[in-house]
Amino acid sequence: LRKKLQRKEKVICVEFDPPMDCRIERFMNDAEYLKEQGIDAITIADCPIARARVDSSLLACKLHRELGIDVIPHMTCRDRNINATKALLFGLNIEDIYNVLVVTGDPIPAADRQEVKGVFSFNSQLLAGYIRDLNETTFPHPFLIFGALNVNAANFKQELLKAKQKIQQGVQAFLTQPIHSAKGLQNLQQAHRELDAWILGGVMPIVSYRNALYMKNEIAGIEVDDAILSRYEHKNREEAAVLAVTIAKATIDEMVSFVDGFYLITPFHRVEIMQQIIAHIQQMDD
């Protein structure tokens, strides 16, 4: 992955949420299917919305070992102290996994806080700096450190400042939040001008009107233009899937000049939708 970015080739990374239990077959089958489509890496969230799922780093090891594909496990500051984090990084390096996305992590839901306590002894910037120091002193093969970039932030000037601070701490590449607005595209263009780092533009297909409403109103960090929302009204499942691919392709066409690759987020295991989007990106390269 690092070498392809260094050669200025557009990379394709696809995100899957890990399973919520030990039933792993569908996840592995979908991952193998997407590998066959020619993607460059799979990214794995670390217990999104602070709900326990299969550990992202352990799952990354399984994917890399069994499928031979590059992986980017996410690593939050929510659930581990610095000792546990260092131990996990040692394990990843031994397993030949050299990419990691550092994020502070979603807070523990209020209803769970009596039983589950967040750690948060450091944030994503400090974690990036810690890994950078280990890269320079300890690891035989350095990690490529990814960070998150919210191109939908209300105060994008402040978001850019945070991104520059992350770069100073060792972040070399960013995955952006999904882009579903003109504002998001404008901010992406500004980030491309100002940040000395690789940027992978976020694309998350919207698969229904209900899905669009939920993303617009309930998910922090995502903005959906009303013009996009209205296009999903009265669409059935098949029509919405076609529209999802159409809009994703158009977004990719608009962002391609400002990114070093694409960060595709799979909605509800709909890998058949992702396949069409991946094929579109590959045709652009041809």
Regions found by a protein language model. Give the residues of each.
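Active-site-proximal loop/turn and secondary-structure-junction residues that shape catalytic pockets
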Residues: 16-20, 46-50, 77-79, 104-108, ...
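Active-site cofactor/substrate anionic-group-binding motifs, chiefly glycine-
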Residues: 38-78
